[in-house]
């Protein structure tokens, strides 16, 4: 469950290390973001020489959440951290690598490029 002011790890090589959620996109009453939701975020920690700088406002897709959630088959899944991947136009990732596992729900939400770059899909 990601809401405004939540800080997330960035799981790609764009140079951002940590972002803070500003808004969960998808209507005026959307309160929480789940895996596969797009958020608007601010870069809080960045490495020098990266694509993004501290203070940049970016769009990102949530790939892992620490809060468990149920799947249609009755199973539950949760991750150790809250993580996101920065995206650009046409919802393609801005980085060329993705670190750590991603949730299977991204495939259903048509983030195929992220799924193909990920080392593991759970």
UniProtKB/Swiss-Prot annotation:
Superkingdom of origin: Bacteria
Keywords per UniProt: Ribonucleoprotein, Ribosomal protein, RNA-binding, rRNA-binding
SMART domains in alphabetical order: Ribosomal_L14 (SM01374)
InterPro entries, sorted: Ribosomal_uL14 (IPR000218), Ribosomal_uL14_bac-type (IPR005745), Ribosomal_uL14_CS (IPR019972), Ribosomal_uL14_sf (IPR036853)
Gene3D superfamilies per UniProt: Ribosomal protein L14 (2.40.150.20)
HAMAP family: Ribosomal_uL14 (MF_01367)
Record's protein name: Large ribosomal subunit protein uL14
Natural source organism: Chloroflexus aurantiacus (strain ATCC 29366 / DSM 635 / J-10-fl)
């Amino acid at each position: 469950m990601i809401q405004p002011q939540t800080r997330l790890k960035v799981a790609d090589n764009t140079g951002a290390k940590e972002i803070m959620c500003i808004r969960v996109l998808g209507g005026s009453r959307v309160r929480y973001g789940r895996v596969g939701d797009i958020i608007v975020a601010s870069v809080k920690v960045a490495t020098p020489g990266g694509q993004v700088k501290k203070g940049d406002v970016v769009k990102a897709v949530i790939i892992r959440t620490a809060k468990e959630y149920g799947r249609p088959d009755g199973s539950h899944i949760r991750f150790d951290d809250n993580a996101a991947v920065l995206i650009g136009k046409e919802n393609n990732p801005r980085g060329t690598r993705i670190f750590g596992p991603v949730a299977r729900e991204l495939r259903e939400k048509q983030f195929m490029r992220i799924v193909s770059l990920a080392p593991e899909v759970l």
